[in-house]
Amino acid sequence: MGWSCIILFLVATATGVHSQVQLQQPGAELVRPGSSVKLSCKASGYTFTSYWMDWVKQRPGQGLEWIGNIYPSDSETHYNQKFKDKATLTVDKSSSTAYMQLSSLTSEDSAVYYCAR
């Protein structure tokens, strides 16, 4: 049986009037089908606990799909029902970093993933 892989591209976007607001993600992940991956999004230039962090998926040639969001102050989450069993959103307030864990990966999970404030 041949080796197969899933490629996840990670992109960060930030909104707001302050140009120093930054969201930093690793460039790409290469993972095996059936495995899980934890994507990170490190925030700087604003009060991390005061803004919702959203996660969005875009497959090649397709539109954006909202996965869910998390409020870092109390870790309240909302999920698109489609991703309820796929994605788990968490934060580490001490490092101002948001995380999204994707489980049971398949070829359908090969996409660009955005974190956005």
Curated annotation (Swiss-Prot):
Disulfide bonds join 41-115. Residues 69-85 are annotated as: Complementarity-determining-2. It holds the Pfam family V-set. Residues 20-49 are annotated as: Framework-1. Residues 55-68 are annotated as: Framework-2. InterPro entries: Ig-like_dom, Ig-like_dom_sf, Ig-like_fold, Ig_V-set, IgHV. GO terms for biological process: adaptive immune response. The keyword Cytoplasm does not apply. Residues 50-54 are annotated as: Complementarity-determining-1. GO terms for cellular component: extracellular region; immunoglobulin complex. Residues 1-19 form the signal peptide. Keywords: Adaptive immunity, Disulfide bond, Immunity, Immunoglobulin, Signal. Residues 86-117 are annotated as: Framework-3. SMART domains: IGv. This germline gene belongs to a set of closely related genes that could encode V regions of NPb antibodies. This is Ig heavy chain V region 3.
